[in-house]
């Protein structure tokens, strides 16, 4: 049975690169895919082009779900009989030269492309973050709070360029929960929730030693350390010397300008804080880390869907998250922070570490179960198929 990548490679009929000075290939890459049989029309996808240029047997990158998403979105339209053109969301040179029935695009570059499409094209904005105004306000607020609390000023990596994708879209897709949805409700556009397709899954934590790991916690996230609350978590654990924090994320690469310098002592010279750096979620090392921890702590200030939290839940970790982390959590398997303060984080950490082994086991198993039931590639594909059916019905009405 062919993989998605192999299937798409079989049906690629034309691939060309446009080279421009100081422009990476994926900013101008173009892929044209044809279905088996007669085409029902054209679809334009503006998202991650890199996925379509993988070498034979090269795995889909697991550092973000968007690499698989791009392939699957194209594949769904192909299976339904459409011709699909794929460009990178950073492609600033592409001009639509044909009629498209449907346009799926991420927030970047959406407005420019939407203005160039035929009027009857149905335009879908794939929003993988909260609204940029909310996001940027939250990012600045966290940096301001850090300045007031510790006299440290850092630039946020998470500031997003303004965009008007929602204003030019007919439909909106999101990967998060009600929080993310609320930031777009002002538009009065139809909003469709897609479950995050976790990059990897893990076996049920049946052999986990909960007595041994009850005081070990994990912060796991991508760039934007202050935005995602790592500074708060670090300060909480400085006051909990008998509890341990493991940090997995691109600390040295982070562009929160000098986070690793400003927090060097805390990161690398504190007995109960263990900084790993970026971790491959498919590696035995990461599995060992999750097996040795009881919970993930993720007090993010704004997300489009907390993919790192979902990965941790798949590994059987109990989620301790902010509402803005945009992951549905209830008290049967996790805790939603109400204040995102150091004192609250300390209180919750002590509460979790003090629970009975059977309580911890039940919560961890439930987190794993919810992740397996909701956040899978199969469920993402099903939800996107349902969306396409709705768009097709809308297209028929518009004709």
List each language-model region with its residue ranges.
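Membrane-proximal helix-turn-helix segments that form the acceptor-binding/catalytic region
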Residues: 147-172
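Aromatic "clamp/platform" in nucleotide-sugar-dependent glycosyltransferases that forms part
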Residues: 301
């Amino acid at each position: 049975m062919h993989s998605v990548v192999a299937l798409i490679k079989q049906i690629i009929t034309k691939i060309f690169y446009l080279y421009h000075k100081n422009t990476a290939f994926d900013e101008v890459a173009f892929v044209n895919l044809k279905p088996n049989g007669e085409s029902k029309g054209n679809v334009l996808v503006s998202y991650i082009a890199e996925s379509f240029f993988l070498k034979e047997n090269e795995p889909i990158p697991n550092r973000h779900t968007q690499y698989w998403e791009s392939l699957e979105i194209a594949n769904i339209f192909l299976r339904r009989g459409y011709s699909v053109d794929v460009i990178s969301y950073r492609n600033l040179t592409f001009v639509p030269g044909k009629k498209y029935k449907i346009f799926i695009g991420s927030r970047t570059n959406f407005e420019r492309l939407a203005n160039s499409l035929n009027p009857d094209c149905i335009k879908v904005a794939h929003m993988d973050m909260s609204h940029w105004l909310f996001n940027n306000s939250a990012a600045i607020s966290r940096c301001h709070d850090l300045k007031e609390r510790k006299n440290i000023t850092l630039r946020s990596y998470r500031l997003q360029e303004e965009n008007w994708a929602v204003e030019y879209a007919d439909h909106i897709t999101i990967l998060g929960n009600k929080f993310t949805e609320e930031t777009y409700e002002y538009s009065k556009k139809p909003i469709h929730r897609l479950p995050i397709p976790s990059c990897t899954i893990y076996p049920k934590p049946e052999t986990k030693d909960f007595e041994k790991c009850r005081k070990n916690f994990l912060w796991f996230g991508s760039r934007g350390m202050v935005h995602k609350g790592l500074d708060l978590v670090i300060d909480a654990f400085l006051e909990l010397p008998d509890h341990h924090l493991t940090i997995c994320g691109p600390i040295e690469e982070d562009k929160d300008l000098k986070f690793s310098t400003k927090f060097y002592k805390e990161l690398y010279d504190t007995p109960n804080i263990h900084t790993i750096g970026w971790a491959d979620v498919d590696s035995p090392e990461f599995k060992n880390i999750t097996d040795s921890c009881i919970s993930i702590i993720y007090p993010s200030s704004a997300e489009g869907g907390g993919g790192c939290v979902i990965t941790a839940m798949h590994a059987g970790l109990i989620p301790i998250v902010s509402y803005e982390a945009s992951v549905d959590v209830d008290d049967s398997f996790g805790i939603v922070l109400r204040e995102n303060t150091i004192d609250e984080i300390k209180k919750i950490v002590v509460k979790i570490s003090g629970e009975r082994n059977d309580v911890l086991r039940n919560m961890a198993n439930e987190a794993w179960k919810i992740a397996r039931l909701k956040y899978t590639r199969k469920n993402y594909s099903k939800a996107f198929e349902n969306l396409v059916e709705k768009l097709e019905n809308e297209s028929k009405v518009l004709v």
